[in-house]
Amino acid sequence: MIDSSKKQPQGFPEILTAEDFEPFKEKECLEGSNQKSLKEVLQLRLQQRRTREQLVDQGIMPPLKSPAAFHEQIKSLERARTENFLKHKIRSRPDRSELVRMHILEETFAEPSLQATQMKLKRARLADDLNEKIAQRPGPMELVEKNILPVDSSVKEAIIGVVKEDYPHTHGEFSFDEDSSDALSPDQPASQESQGSAASPSEPKVSASPPPVTASTPAQFTSVSPAVPEFLKTPLTADQPPTRSTAPVLPTNTVSSAKSGPMLVKQSHPKNPNDKHRSKKCKDPKPRVKKLKYHQYIPPNQKGEKSEPQMDSNYARLLQQQQLFLQLQILSQQQQQQQQQHYNYQTILPAPIKTDKNSSSGSNSGSSSSMPARRPGPLPSSLDDLKVSELKTELKLRGLPVSGTKPDLIERLKPYQEVTSSNLATGSIVAVSSATIVTSNPEVTVALPVTTLHNAVTSSVSTFKADLALPATSSVPHVENAHSPLPISPSPSEQSSLSTDDTNMTDTFTEIMTMMSPSQLLCSSPLRVVSHDDSLSPSSSTLSTLELDAAEKDRKLQEKEKQIEELKRKLEQEQKLVEVLKMQLEVEKRGQQRPPDPQPSDPPHPFNTSDPKHGSVGSSIKDEASLPDCSSPQQPITVPGHSVGQPISTGSQTLVAKKTVVVKQEVPMAQAEQQNVVSQFYLSSQGQPPALVAQPQALLTTQTTQLLLPVSIQGSNVTSVQLPVGSLQLQTPAQGRVQAQPHVAAATQVPAAALPSALTSALPQKQEAFPQHVLGQPQPVRKVFTNSAPNTVLQYQRQPGPTNQQPFVSKTSNPALQSRTAPLAPLQNGPSLASKPSSPPPPQQFVVQHSLFATPITKTKDPPRYEEAIKQTRSTQPALPEVSSVHSQQMDDLFDILIKSGEISFPIKEEPSPISKMKPVTASITTMPVNTVVSRPPPQVQIAPPVSLEPVNSLSASLENQLEAFLDGTLPSATDTGPLQNSSEDRESFSLIEDLQNDLLSHSSMLYQSHSPMETSEAQLVSGTPCLSLDLSDSNLDNMEWLDITMPTTSSGLTPLSTTAPSMFSADFLDPQDLPLPWD
């Protein structure tokens, strides 16, 4: 074996080549090195092992002198002792709750949210500690100076030399922070000068980011306005020589810094990491600030460069932040008080310009440290009459040096005197009562609540841009359109829906004040006043740029906090409103009619406190109807019964993003004719006093709530119905903007018995309007079905009139006018009109809920409950089948008369069966959440006139008279769109007469019920016989309220329906199973 192993290496060269042999060599080398390292480790271990004596001392080995058993005993004793010690420790350890309280253990049983907040607090505390340590760590210059950082000696000398050169400038930067620490009270004089250092171009470090120079609008307001903020003071430019000219010229360096990027005011001096002054003085609890009295004043040219102790930049920044925050707080408080006391702005004259002459980098600290807390008043005309002491006090108030002879003092005060007189001469009205006049570069942001001067009401805040005119004498911007009585219409991208009606503003305001907290009446979105740098004349140098980067940040933080608070407040208000509306629903269900509200004719007065750019939720509270969003910013909205078409500046795409909460106030029928924006719709029956018109309890559209239009109807025959639903902000899916619904300007109701002349309804009011305007716009089919006594079925069809003579119901070649032959599927929260192949998406139908009280009662009595109503409905059924014989003959007579008199052209249509003629048209109006409001088509109203028993001659005569009266009363004197829209609805309202024979539906498939959980009740419209369906909706015609029928008096509704006249309902229509009443 050994021989063979010896021989084997000799055969290797034959088998393996040299390359194959290399790995083996490497392996051997590795093994050898490993053994070497192991040897070394072993050697080290042996060297470091403890001696026998040490092991004995530690009780590991028994001592040589004593026996081993004794050693074992000692060991067991020691073990027992440590065991006892541990047991004692375990017994005496604190309770778990104590450990949790000391934050050693985490609470496991506590709520997760509580734990999360605790963890956040803990992290915040740690972060604060870290930030403090980081803020107080020495800067690199300090480390170099104290030889902590190893730097070459030549570099170190050069750095120290540069720091010494920079020292006067950095010192000047801090004099502002030292002095401004006094100016915390609102009564502090406005003349306290803030100073920014304008770095000279010779300093490469500083000029890389030139510090901003404070520019001011030295606005000393009247007693109404708050004290001028600390940051609105005249600049002390560091390089400016002491002169006595009235308009100090900014050095070129200052102008360049005015155009540079926005700087922080908290760091009014850019934080230079290479500055020497980053010391740890901040750790001292009370940094020493040297205060000079006035008699110790030294002119700046004689003052030693390093005469005052410098402040640490961290502390200076902290002081400045605190001051700015306090000033903003004080200003906002004063603004709140001011706006609560005086709702309209008083004339505010700009204050005198405070020019600084003898100012250099360090002069300010001595002059302004102990200023009296009194505002500088206007100077008298002749300064020579003043005593020297008075002149000195005036100088002190303006922060000027008081040393020198009387002529010197007068000379110093003269510029202020001239400026005051010139400003008084201009007498400009400046509505700058805002807390933040802040410039970020060329843009001055001024928060100005837009008010109407007559009404003392803060209507809203519109965001717009106005050029800032800078007069040569005063540097306060004259914002001239801040006082326009109508709201300023913003650019389309920045919208806010404003509507101001001067007559009713104060009433609306008092009501809104009850709903909204006063802080929401303050300005929440700032006006942006853009100042152009070209307009900076030498005298208006005080507006170059404010040293306000920190103020910007503070302001942004505060704005965010305010927004959060406002959103919280709005949430609470919405919850309160929901509660109120629930209460009102309860009250309405019990039939307790309320006394008339004190503001019957309030216009919609939306409060849109949110900045449209942020897209935050604006809650708009409106009386009677929400303001419809026009499709163009200046488009007038036709308000029925109110002949002023007021331009309402509303938006297009931007407002779609807002969820507006529309709250309708309840106003009883006694004042129904006075309401401006309510769409009223009466059906009063003959021989009985009209019942109280039911008011919509709520139209609250939030993201999840559904439209609810409860209408309670009293009396079996008394059918006065008012549906102010013009405020539904709906829209056909084809259009991309929110549109207001067109209002139906009058209902056409054929008298059911011999009519008293006072009660003849506005049936032909539409007839004269047909040829007047070419209505090329197709109008949406509208159906409203009031679920009440037998006489109240109305059918109303809006049709496009392509030409003057075109009948409303005619078979045109328009493919969209398809006859509705197929029955409609029940609508489940969405538009689904069946069998209209070529029409655009059909208009959405909405559920209008009515609670049916079917007993004739007077206004004061409660309506019957639900069960009684059902019984009474059943009791009315036997009278129903008398309908069929009368109906078609009466309608044919009516149509003949109308066609002969030329009011309508003869329609080409099929004669439907008499069974279909007697069928009423019902409306199913399904509810949808608000997020679909933008794409929602307009509601459909179809009103079917009942039978007429009156001779048609007197009817047509009364119709023409009524038309003139109606047109006089209702057509608003707005711009061109107003009459066009009204005439369109005129024609549309009359279309029901022609539509009647086509649109009355087949007997069998008349009613579908949609039983989705929110849509409780109305019967579904189904079409059996051929009839024309107009599903086209138009944007121009959608700018009017729908169902907008304003009557001359409360007693004259639409045509009274006699109680004895046969009804149009078929018997199975009023079957309680077909007509669910879900109002529980």
Swiss-Prot record:
* Positions of region (Required for interaction with itself and with MRTFA): 557-585
Pro residues: which segments have biased composition? 595-606
Any one GO MF term held by the record is:
DNA-binding transcription factor activity
Which Pfam families does the entry link to?
A: RPEL (PF02755), SAP (PF02037)
Query: What is the first-listed, main subcellular location in coarse terms?
Result: nucleus
Annotated tissue distribution: Widely expressed. High expression in heart, brain and testis. Lower expression in lung, liver and kidney.
What PANTHER family does this protein map onto?
A: MYOCARDIN-RELATED TRANSCRIPTION FACTOR B, MYOCARDIN-RELATED TRANSCRIPTION FACTOR-RELATED
The protein's name in its UniProt record? Myocardin-related transcription factor B
